[in-house]
Amino acid sequence: MKNISDYRNKKVLVLGLAKSGVNAARLLHKLGALVTVNDKQQFDDNKDAQELLADGMRVITGRHPVELLDEHFELMVKNPGIPYSNPMVKRAEALHMPIITEPELAYQVSEAQWIGITGTNGKTTTTTLIGLMLNQQRPHHAFDAGNIGIPVSQVAQKVGKDDTIVAELSSFQLCGIKTLHPHIAVLTNIYEAHLDWHGNRANYVAAKMRITMNQTPDDYFIMNWDLPEMHELAKQSKAQIVPFSRKNAEGARAQLIDGWLTFDGDRIMKASEMQIPGLHNIENALAAIAAVKLEGVGDDAIREVLRTFSGVKHRIQYLETIDGRRVYNDSKATNVEAATVALNAFDQPIVWLAGGLDRGLPMDALTPLVKKHVKSMVVFGQTAPLMAKIGKDAGVPVQTTENVMTAVPLAYEVSRPGDVILLSPAAASWDQYPNFEVRGDDFIKAVNQLKATVESGDK
């Protein structure tokens, strides 16, 4: 690590825990900082706070007391989810206290090269592909981190100058960077998202563009050239622009041409050979190809990854082929938009498993997609009546069941070889499950049980 002495005896307030806050606090403590941790959750229910206290850090829980800032902290490391409208953050700004998020801290002490990935959709898949391709070429030297679920401050402690941190960076995280400077930055796309947090679209776009703010003409900024907005945004960057395009946009270096994934006009592989389905994943693959080509990765490594990578867990993740039916887990699809992407990803007839928490949102936009792509539906959860109506309006058979586990055998019964069985709930999981991951894990269990039953000859 570098810049270790910068933190020795420095008074630092870590505001908000969760994974990023805990790891930031531990790193700062290791560097010799005088760490105070403040988290809203009560101490008795706060395992993270209890562990940090046992490690020798000062811990204040139960609320965010603004008067705490009278203690003259020299730095605040803010949990990315806490908005800048929070009274503690506003007071810190009034005191001209530096406020950063955990990736900035990690960058300041890390000796590794950085590749940063942001965007509304596709961040996690693109990050994962880049890491896999780099490690396929040169094993054990690329490390995925950030919004993907592994705090960057955890990774920063174990990497060296010859390594690469491949960091997924959310708009929330990017708002709190100061010096973070990825050699390669990727902006997958920009759509409407998180406007409640950012206040308006302009602020959201500005947050995303912070990924390139410290880049120089020696760096690269990979952008989606199929979106006209990107052409204007590119003018804000000092880096070399490396466009990618699925639609043959002029000037793109990574492109889909006549069904081939290409870079600088050279064919790498047919898009149809990719394990992960969908036009959106072609875009993710092109962004990843652009990034790793700039790092000197060969075509063989790229092909190996794209032919074998079955998807990020719970995101149109290929699970199994059971008696000719391909099964996909898209439990992450917690809204209509995400389910739309999944339904559009397949040319084969779909048996669709859907349902979950009823947020009172309109779902009518799914009806024409069901009519076009779906042969049968199995619905569950609070939104089961809504989903059943969509199926009825589309002229598709619908079965209602209790949950994901009971839906899987029903889906198999109405499917035929050549079909796709797809869990893409179009709803949050909280009516029956603590999160979409648990829902997806239940689906995986049910699919494994079904496979065992079918292969034993009981079905």
UniProtKB/Swiss-Prot annotation:
GO MF annotation terms: ATP binding; UDP-N-acetylmuramoylalanine-D-glutamate ligase activity
Keywords: ATP-binding, Cell cycle, Cell division, Cell shape, Cell wall biogenesis/degradation, Cytoplasm, Ligase, Nucleotide-binding, Peptidoglycan synthesis
Principal place of residence: cytoplasm
UniProt pathway annotation: Cell wall biogenesis; peptidoglycan biosynthesis
BP GO annotations: cell division; cell wall organization; peptidoglycan biosynthetic process; regulation of cell shape
EC number(s) given by UniProt: 6.3.2.9
Cellular localization per UniProt: Cytoplasm
Gene Ontology annotations for the cellular component aspect, listed alphabetically: cytoplasm
Binding site for ATP: G119, T120, N121, G122, K123, T124, T125
Uppermost EC category: ligase
Origin: domain of life: Bacteria
Keyword Cell wall biogenesis/degradation: yes
InterPro entries per the UniProt record, alphabetical: Mur-like_cat_sf, Mur_ligase_C, Mur_ligase_C_dom_sf, Mur_ligase_cen, MurD
Catalytic activity: UDP-N-acetyl-alpha-D-muramoyl-L-alanine + D-glutamate + ATP = UDP-N-acetyl-alpha-D-muramoyl-L-alanyl-D-glutamate + ADP + phosphate + H(+)
Family under the similarity heading: Belongs to the MurCDEF family.
Annotated function: Cell wall formation. Catalyzes the addition of glutamate to the nucleotide precursor UDP-N-acetylmuramoyl-L-alanine (UMA).
Protein name: UDP-N-acetylmuramoylalanine--D-glutamate ligase
Gene label: murD
